[in-house]
């Protein structure tokens, strides 16, 4: 058994643990005593071996110390000697550097002189070559060898750049420019012929010549000039066909008039929208052919030549295109078609009054824009290999004819919506007369309620038109227009409410100040109103309650529309933020590499093909303004239609005020003269028998009010059922609605009654008993409606029911603490009770 000494070197060595583990590792047949003896003997032997080894190694180390000391001393002496040698070498190097610095400087000057001499020699060679080229260039031109002439002119240009601004060669520089123009003029006819007849080899050779003399721009211009001719002819075919059709129609009309028959012309004017589709199809086919031909003829330039051709085309056709678009919008409406005018003429105010911009005008423009959008998508696919900047410029040129219309989109939309809102009829067309007010009110309320979804549909259509026509780039103008139109519509509703107040009999009756009516006339007028109320009061009440549904519908529909508008703005924010590259907008597209193509464009590059981004990418101020607005739409507190939201709330308040005035009008009418009733001051008649001669029943004025209040829940029930559709929550809302209005009217009636009671100057004992009965009846009605009795009304009832001689004692008793003191004192004053 070998003894492992490893555990003894561990700093955390535990002797007890080591002994226990050794005992556990013994053979089962060995006794513990024997194992411990063997272990002790092995430890002792190992200890002796370690001690002997240490003694031997220590002796050897002592013998090596003197030798090592001598070696260290020798190395120290060598180091001192080496340091001295190095110091001497450094001193010699410093001396050598000082003596050779002048030599090196002289050599540097000589080298500079050599370089200048070589440059001068080369310049002289270039000058000599330039002189020789100048003398032989005419011969080269005379030979008609255009490639050689191009090489000669290129060599002259290189020589001139080497010579620099030397006065002696100023004439040569001018001569070179003249020669380059001359060579370009010689190339152009051949280039025109090569482009016209699609001569690939000739076109390539001429391209090399133009590039050699730095006139590649001439190739672009000549290419566009040649290729534009068939496109312009294609564009002018529309006017030619229109004139031909017009002449044919006039000829047919003259023949019909001369012959007297009913012959009708079969020829008709071709609409610009249908013609534009065919024009775009033919133009796209033409560009596809050019793209393929240029890929062969100009493999390095086709990705710029063909897009620039389209840009030049749209530039040449721009004014005519805008004019045709304008006339095409006018053709959508007979009035403007007859005058040969369009939407731009309407906006400028050149047409007679009564002819306004209609939805059809803008829809026709959007249809043409959609046709152009389809063409633009095909162009994007065709030019996908071109650089992003070139592609965006090309698509911007395609949409350029619509730019003037887009800039006036807000004005167009506002005019369209304003005219559409103006034709909304909110008044019920009913002849005034007895029994007609209720019908007129009901019809007007019905029309008001039906107009709300109609107006919302108009606003939603405007949002769709904005997205379809401008891609959302005019969203800020759209919001302003929608807000203004909503204000216009709500103003119409407010004016209608004012007229309904007259219909309902709660306004427009005059204040009576300065009235010249005599007493009999006033009595007849009051009688007529009473008759009218008895016949129509409940129909007017029902009609007035229906106005609440108008306010509720307007509030809910406007809220839903505004939420939908915010969602639309949020979607625009997401798409435009990506399209316009965020903060890189100020730099436009400069962060994209010039060699980057659509094949490896980033997401932002691909999204930039959006019609709105194409329009905004070069107008960062407008883009940032729009993005700021769209970013604000994310805030839950944001109101897309801020002014309209305020006016909707104000309209709801006005409706509530009108409904309350209608519901309280009968109460106001019945209680209007209560404080001046003669019964309050009447006295008891003297009779031979002590019998009461006052009425123990409530008077008609208070029973009429009570019956009205008790009947009111039945009138509110149909409207509450209309609010409650499905679900317990809606039922609870309906119950709350009915209860709320019931309490409003009851509280108002109670307040009016108490005001009349306060106006009584004197009341007799008989009058007090009668008024106590009236108040008790009204209190019972309020209790039946689950309304608390106001303390003031309860005080009136208590003080009036108490006999005159006992009132002082009641007020001084504990029961008097429950009374309203000012009211109790007022009753005492009415009953002429003094506390002195």
Swiss-Prot record:
Pfam families: COG7
Gene Ontology biological-process entries: embryo development ending in seed dormancy; Golgi organization; intracellular protein transport; meristem development; meristem structural organization; protein retention in Golgi apparatus; shoot system morphogenesis; unidimensional cell growth
Region entry Disordered, spans: 246-265
Keywords, comma-separated and alphabetical: Coiled coil, Golgi apparatus, Membrane, Protein transport, Transport
Localization in the cell: Golgi apparatus membrane
UniProt membrane topology term: Peripheral membrane protein
Disruption phenotype: Abnormal coloration and morphology of embryos leading to bushy plants, with aberrant organization of the shoot apical meristem (SAM) and unexpanded leaves with irregular phyllotaxy, as well as small and round epidermal cells. Disrupted hydrophobic layers of epidermal cells. Mislocalization of Golgi proteins (e.g. ERD2) and altered size of the Golgi apparatus.
Coiled coil feature spans: 29-49, 107-127
GO CC annotation terms, alphabetical: Golgi membrane; Golgi transport complex
Role summary: Required for normal Golgi function. Necessary for embryo development and pigmentation, especially for the expansion of cells and organs, and for the formation of the organized shoot apical meristem (SAM). Probably involved in the generation of the extra-cellular matrix.
Subunit-level organization: Component of the conserved oligomeric Golgi complex which is composed of eight different subunits and is required for normal Golgi morphology and localization. Interacts with COG5 and COG6.
Protein family: Belongs to the COG7 family.
Protein's recorded name: Conserved oligomeric Golgi complex subunit 7
Gene this chain is encoded by: COG7
């Amino acid at each position: 058994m070998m003894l492992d000494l490893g555990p003894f070197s561990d700093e955390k060595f535990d002797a007890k643990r080591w002994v226990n583990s050794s005992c556990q590792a013994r053979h089962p047949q060995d006794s513990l005593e024997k194992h411990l003896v063997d272990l002790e003997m092995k430890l002792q032997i190992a200890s002796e071996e370690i001690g002997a080894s240490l003694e031997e190694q220590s002796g050897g180390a002592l013998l090596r110390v003197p030798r090592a000391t001598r070696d260290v001393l020798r190395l120290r002496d060598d180091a001192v000697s080496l340091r001295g040698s190095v110091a001497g070498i450094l001193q010699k190097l410093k001396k050598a550097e000082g003596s050779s610095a002048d030599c090196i400087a002289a050599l540097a000057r000589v080298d500079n002189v050599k370089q200048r001499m070589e440059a001068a020699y080369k310049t002289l060679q270039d000058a000599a070559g330039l002189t020789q080229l100048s003398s032989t260039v005419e011969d080269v031109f005379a030979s008609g060898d255009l490639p050689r002439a191009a090489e000669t002119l290129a060599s002259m240009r290189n020589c001139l750049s080497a010579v620099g601004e030397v006065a002696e060669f100023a004439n040569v520089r001018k001569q070179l420019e003249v020669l380059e123009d001359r060579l370009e003029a010689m190339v152009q006819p051949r280039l025109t012929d090569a482009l016209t007849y699609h001569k690939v080899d000739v076109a390539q050779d001429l391209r090399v010549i133009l590039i050699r003399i730095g006139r590649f721009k001439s190739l672009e211009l000549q290419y566009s000039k040649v290729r534009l001719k068939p496109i312009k002819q294609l564009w002018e075919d529309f006017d030619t066909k229109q004139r031909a059709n017009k002449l044919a129609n006039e000829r047919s009309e003259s023949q019909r008039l001369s012959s007297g028959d009913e012959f009708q012309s079969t020829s008709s004017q071709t609409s610009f929208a249908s013609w534009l589709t065919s024009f775009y199809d033919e133009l796209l086919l033409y560009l596809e052919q050019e793209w393929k031909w240029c890929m062969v003829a100009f493999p390095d330039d086709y990705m710029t030549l063909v897009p620039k051709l389209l840009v030049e085309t749209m530039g040449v056709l721009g004014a005519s295109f805008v004019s045709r678009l304008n006339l095409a919008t006018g053709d959508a409406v007979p009035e403007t078609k007859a005058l040969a005018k369009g939407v731009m003429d309407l906006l400028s105010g050149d047409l007679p009054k009564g002819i306004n911009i209609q939805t059809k005008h803008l829809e026709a423009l959007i249809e043409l824009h959609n046709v152009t959008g389809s063409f633009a998508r095909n162009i994007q696919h065709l030019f996908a290999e071109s650089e992003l900047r070139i592609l965006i410029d090309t698509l911007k040129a395609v949409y350029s004819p619509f730019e003037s219309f887009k800039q006036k989109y807000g004005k167009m939309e506002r005019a369209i919506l304003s005219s559409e809102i103006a034709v909304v009829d909110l008044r019920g067309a009913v002849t005034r007369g007895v029994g007609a007010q209720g019908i007129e009110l009901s019809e007007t309320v019905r029309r008001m309620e039906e107009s709300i979804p109609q107006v919302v549909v108009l606003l939603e259509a405007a949002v769709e038109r904005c997205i379809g026509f401008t891609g959302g780039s005019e969203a800020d103008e759209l919001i302003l227009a929608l807000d203004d139109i909503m204000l216009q519509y709500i103003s119409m509703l407010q004016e209608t409410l004012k007229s309904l107040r007259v219909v309902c009999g709660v306004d427009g009756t005059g204040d009576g100040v300065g009235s010249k009516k005599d007493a009999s006339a006033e009595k007849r007028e009051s009688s007529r109103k009473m008759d009218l109320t008895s016949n129509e009061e409940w129909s007017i009440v029902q009609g007035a309650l229906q106005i609440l549904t108008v306010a509720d519908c307007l509030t809910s529909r406007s809220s839903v529309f505004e939420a939908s508008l915010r969602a639309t703005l949020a979607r625009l924010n997401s798409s435009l933020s990506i399209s316009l590259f965020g903060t890189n907008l100020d730099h436009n597209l400069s962060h994209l590499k010039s060699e980057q193509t659509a094949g490896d464009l980033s997401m932002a590059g691909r999204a930039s093909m959006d019609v709105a981004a194409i329009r905004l990418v070069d107008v960062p101020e407008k883009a940032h303004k729009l993005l700021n607005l769209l970013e604000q739409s994310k805030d839950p507190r944001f109101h897309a239609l801020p002014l309209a939201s305020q006016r909707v709330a104000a309209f709801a308040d006005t409706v509530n005020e009108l409904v309350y005035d209608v519901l309280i009008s009968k109460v106001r009418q019945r209680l209007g003269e209560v404080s001046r009733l003669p019964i309050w001051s009447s006295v008891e008649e003297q009779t031979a028998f002590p019998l009461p001669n006052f009425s123990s029943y409530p008077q008609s004025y208070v029973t009429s009010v009570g019956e009205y209040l008790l009947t009111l829940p039945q009138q509110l029930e149909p409207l509450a059922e209309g609010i409650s559709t499905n679900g317990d929550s809606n039922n609870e809302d309906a119950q709350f609605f009915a209860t709320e209005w019931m309490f409003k009217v009851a509280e108002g009636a109670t307040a009016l009654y108490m005001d009349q009671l306060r106006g009584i100057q004197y009341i007799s004992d008989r009058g007090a008993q009668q008024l106590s009965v009236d108040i008790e009846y009204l209190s019972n009605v309020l209790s039946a409606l689950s309304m608390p009795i106001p303390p003031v009304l309860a005080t009136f009832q208590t003080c009036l029911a108490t006999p005159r001689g006992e009132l002082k004692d009641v007020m001084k008793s504990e029961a008097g603490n429950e009374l309203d003191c000012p009211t109790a004192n007022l009753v005492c004053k009415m009953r002429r009770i003094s506390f002195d």
